[in-house]
């Protein structure tokens, strides 16, 4: 049925229509005269043309000698958006790609409008020298690294990788290690030759204890004692034990103590020949010793964003100190993580990875980013080698987050297809992917179309969901958001597992990881869109009504600030000084 006319739009009487037509004719005549006299009302003049403006992005950049930086120009006020590029100190293509020359100093890149040659915009480019390479290989009868001393039977060729770790050209024999490994319980200061990846056991220190005795994860047969003969392909990881366990603060969570009895580790790699000065250390899991090169890093792919809250932005040096030394990641629950600088819980690893990667998206100079970039890429290389060797970090509550991002970060910067496709070659080895799933994929397929509160993407539970949609373990350890809260499985009448871990120990640590991948434009190579949709849900979904309904149906209360969706800061507050950094970055750049 057609809507009736509104009283104000109904036709008037005939005289009124006539008056309206007279007025319309006068108005048209006036408009015609105006069009002949121009905008200023002066006969014979044309309207002022729009002003052409041009801007350039970024307005400043720091580039190493011989490296490239992409610039772009934005034109307004004309349909001709063509620009003419020019540069000092290097060359620039017609597409705005600048290549730095060999001279160090400050130079400019300029974009000039071809519609109006009087309009241009310039950016300042600081060309810097590359970071000095490690010293060239030499000979030595012993070497010292971060408190570990290895003594050889004779002088051998030694050198350092780009991250500072040592190599020797083998074969060699180690006759002494300081501090010396103990030969009886408690087993301290252990050295392990060629870390195992099959069973998650450790040989560094027998005092494994995270509040309960975990010593069954220790295997004394993994320990090596001098004399140790090493051949090319071998990797010796030597450790220093803490004098007393549970004394080091947990990295990224200051109120806790690290669960590990290991203070620090150093890695000695045995090669058949000295590598180039820009070589990364091969992964400690990689017996084939694949070597990647720092000079191959596409550092210009890192954005140069303004810190949204400078006072809440941590210094690069803090995370350089965390990642400079090896993060050993082959013990099933990180009971032997080097406590001085590595977290002993997956959630805290994910937080550290988030901070490190997001810092590298900011507008620090190229020189300032070099060290942390190298260290973070080295961690990615190590993890990738372990994945290739058959190790993985499948879902287990909050233990297995944080390992995928460093691999993909390294893969993007090295343009390495194997790293970029790690989850294609090795499905079901990353906690974040197994614990985020579209609800309609839960078996039997098509049974569920939405979660209890309407969400399409849900938390996959403690053990998660495999890439093929199969549930690792149903019930207590499986997905549950497809059910009403009254039907959620319980550990006991006073404890939930799934929702408690969703809010305490997993989701909150994935936000920075997802944002870093967005900023690298690497969502496709992550190869699991449910992860990004879930993180968006965590940050944008108002859970006020859901929390009230959970309380009404089950009696469990998740209303504490640190348990709420839409934040990371309340979990980090009091644990890390710059606790709003991830939230600030999300608000500004997501």
Language-model features: locations:
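Extracellular/luminal low-complexity segments enriched in Ser/Thr/Pro
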Residues: 93-105
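Bacterial Sec-dependent N-terminal signal peptides
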Residues: 26, 30-55, 117, 124-135
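A short beta-strand micro-motif common to beta-rich folds, especially ectodomain repeats
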Residues: 104-116
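Solvent-exposed, low-complexity, repeat-rich "mucin-like" stalks and linkers
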Residues: 57-79
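Ser/Thr/Asn(+Pro)-rich, low-complexity disordered segments
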Residues: 134-404, 417-590
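N-terminal secretory signal peptides that target proteins for export/translocation
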Residues: 1-18
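Short, well-ordered beta-strand segments
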Residues: 76-89
């Amino acid at each position: 049925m057609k809507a009736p006319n509104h009283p104000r739009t109904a036709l008037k009487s005939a005289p009124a229509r006539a008056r309206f037509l007279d007025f319309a004719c006068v108005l048209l005549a006036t408009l015609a005269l105006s069009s002949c006299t121009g905008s200023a009302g002066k006969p014979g003049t044309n309207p002022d043309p729009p002003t052409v403006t041009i801007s350039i992005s970024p307005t400043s950049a720091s580039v190493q000698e011989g490296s490239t930086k992409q610039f772009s120009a934005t034109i307004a006020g004309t349909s001709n958006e063509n620009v003419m590029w020019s540069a000092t100190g290097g060359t620039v293509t017609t597409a705005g790609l600048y290549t730095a020359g060999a001279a160090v100093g400050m130079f400019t890149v300029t974009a000039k409008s071809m519609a109006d040659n009087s309009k241009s915009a310039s950016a300042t480019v600081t060309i810097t020298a590359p970071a000095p390479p490690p010293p060239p290989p030499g000979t030595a009868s012993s070497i010292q690294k971060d408190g570990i001393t290895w003594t050889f039977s004779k002088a051998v060729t030694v050198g350092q990788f780009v991250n500072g770790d040592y190599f020797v050209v083998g074969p060699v024999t180690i006759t002494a290690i300081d501090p010396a490994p103990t030969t009886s319980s408690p087993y301290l200061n252990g050295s392990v030759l060629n870390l195992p990846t099959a069973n998650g056991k450790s040989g560094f220190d027998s005092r494994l204890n995270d509040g309960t005795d975990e010593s069954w994860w220790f295997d004394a047969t993994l320990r090596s004692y001098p004399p140790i003969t090493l051949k090319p392909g071998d990797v010796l990881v030597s450790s220093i034990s803490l004098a007393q366990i549970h004394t080091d603060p947990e990295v990224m969570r200051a109120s806790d103590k690290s669960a590990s009895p290991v203070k620090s580790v150093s890695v000695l790699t045995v090669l058949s020949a000295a590598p180039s000065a820009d070589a990364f250390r091969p992964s400690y899991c990689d017996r084939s010793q694949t070597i990647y090169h720092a000079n191959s890093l596409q550092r210009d792919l890192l954005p140069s964003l303004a810190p949204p809250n400078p006072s809440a932005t941590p210094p690069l040096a803090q995370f350089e100190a965390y990642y400079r030394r090896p993060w050993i990641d082959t013990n099933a629950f990180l009971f032997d993580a080097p406590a001085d600088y590595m977290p002993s819980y997956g959630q805290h690893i994910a937080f550290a990875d988030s901070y490190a990667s997001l810092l590298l998206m900011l507008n620090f100079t190229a020189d300032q980013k070099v060290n942390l970039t190298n260290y973070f890429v080295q961690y990615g290389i190590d993890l990738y080698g372990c994945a290739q060797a058959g190790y993985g970090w499948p879902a287990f509550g909050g233990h297995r987050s944080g390992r995928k991002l460093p691999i993909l970060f390294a893969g993007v910067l090295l343009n390495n297809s194997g790293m970029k496709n790690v989850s294609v070659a090795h499905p079901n080895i990353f906690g974040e992917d197994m614990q985020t799933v579209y609800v309609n994929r839960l078996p039997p397929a098509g049974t569920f179309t939405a979660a209890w509160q309407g969400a399409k993407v849900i938390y996959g539970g403690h053990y998660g969901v495999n890439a093929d949609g199969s549930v690792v373990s149903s019930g207590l350890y499986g997905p549950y958001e497809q059910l009403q809260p009254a039907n959620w499985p319980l550990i006991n009448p006073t404890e939930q597992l799934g929702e408690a871990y969703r809010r305490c120990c997993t989701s909150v640590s994935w936000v920075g990881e997802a944002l870093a991948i967005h900023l690298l434009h690497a969502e496709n190579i992550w190869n699991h869109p449910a992860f990004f949709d879930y993180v968006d849900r965590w940050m944008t979904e108002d859970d006020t009504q859901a929390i009230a309904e959970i309380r009404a149906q089950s009696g469990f209360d998740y209303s504490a600030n640190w348990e709420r969706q839409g934040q990371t800061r309340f979990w980090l507050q009091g644990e890390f000084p710059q606790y709003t950094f991830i939230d600030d970055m999300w608000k500004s750049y997501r």
